[in-house]
Design a protein with these regions (language model features):
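PP2C/PPM-type serine/threonine phosphatase catalytic domain
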Residues: 1-237
């Protein structure tokens, strides 16, 4: 079961988030990207990131070693090359967070401040770590997590796909017994909705699409200052 919902929010004119998934007999991949850049460049970057990763995985699925990592490197190169050739796309970039399943392998990938959470029963755990200026302040002990949530510069990220010719990519290996569901989202959701509220909504609504709708509705009710995207998948809730 897969639920997916992307909304422009209450303030922005353009939705620069993009989410998609493939459930193939060879592998499964679930992705959320949050683009940035002038004109429509953010929308181009997020769309290109997701589609490039999917294309690479489809064409190289027989590879076993570093398949997910290589697919994200490929996407980074695709975005960067276009940004160098097209003035309207110059400086564009995107976050990416995703979950890849192949056989007994479960991997989560992250660049930027989109998030992946694992859910088991009433427990929810953030798998990814934000690549953001505020997260660095939290890690240094300069501010608390609560202060970070309302910090005026919380949207400044320290890593993105496509802004440089190379990028540092986080890969997390997940124990298949650790989780029954995964929730991927852009910061438009995670900035407005606490993880404890996320798991409560996921468990309350038995339909994953309905749960996604309710999560987006809650983020919009709290201001909806950014685009909001959520992708929820796993077994029966």
């Amino acid at each position: 079961m897969v639920g997916i919902k992307s909304d422009v929010g209450n303030v922005r004119e353009l939705n620069e988030d993009y989410a998609a998934f493939i459930e193939d007999e060879r592998f499964k991949i679930y992705l959320v990207a949050d683009g940035m850049g002038g004109h429509n460049a953010g929308e181009i970057a997020s769309n290109l990131a997701v589609k490039s990763i999917m294309r690479y995985l489809m064409e190289h699925s027989e590879e076993n070693e570093d398949l997910l990592l290589n697919s994200v490197k490929y996407a980074n190169n695709e975005i960067y090359e276009i940004s160098q050739k097209n003035d309207k796309c110059k400086g564009m970039g995107t976050t990416i967070t995703g979950c890849f399943i192949k056989g007994d392998i479960i991997q989560v990938v992250n660049v930027g401040d989109s998030c992946c959470f694992s859910i088991k029963g009433n427990e929810i755990k953030k798998v990814t770590k934000d690549h953001s200026w505020v997260q660095e302040l939290i890690d240094a002990g300069a501010i608390t997590e609560e202060e970070g949530r309302v910090h005026p510069k919380k949207n400044i990220i320290t890593r993105a796909l496509g802004t440089n010719s190379s990028v540092k990519i986080d890969i997390f290996n997940i124990d298949k017994n650790e989780s029954t569901m995964f929730l991927l989202c852009s910061d438009g959701l995670s900035n407005e909705v606490q993880k404890e509220e996320m798991v409560e909504i996921v468990n309350r609504y038995k339909n994953v699409n309905e749960a996604c709708e309710k999560l987006v509705d809650l983020a919009k009710a709290r201001g909806g200052k950014d685009n909001i995207t959520v992708l929820l998948f796993g077994g029966e809730v």
